[in-house]
Amino acid sequence: MVTMKKIGNQIPTKSVVLPYTETQGIEAIEKYKPLFNEETDEFSDFVWVTPKTAPKFVNRNGVYCYFVMHGGKPVTLRFRYQYYADEWLFIESMIFNIDGENITIIPDMDTNCGDGGKIWEWCDEAVVGGNSVDEKFIAKIANAKSVKVKMNGSQYYDTRVLTAEQIKSIKDTYEYYKALGGKFTEI
């Protein structure tokens, strides 16, 4: 789970207006709300909104978006990628091939080991302008037919293909975030 410190370090400075009418937003909210879990932080008024299809633990492969509600409004959309395997990669960059277009991101990766010799590496990035993970990147994945990712490590690499379910989950989260009034910001 993301720490409050991580969110606090990524304060937006400029908002972008979204093209959702009130009626479209209400219809989208009714459509997407059942696809998500909401977990309230007992020490603040933060509510974590995560797709029901997202892995519950770090020691699982996964890719998804989620966001936090604060004061009843959605806060920065986030992109999470989790790698779980037998071999360390020490991921330094990731190349996403989205319907034939390559987009490179330089994620801020965390690593851990355990679980009978297995390892896991993950990134959790704010979706904001000025980052390599911005709204255009998420929109491309959300509307893609095919997404492959090459994780370039310090000595090795691995490739994965996003499933149709993972792509749909990113699209659902993106649309739900916008329907709730979520804004994309510049840092």
Predicted features, each with a name:
Residues 2-187:
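A generic "folded-domain core" signal
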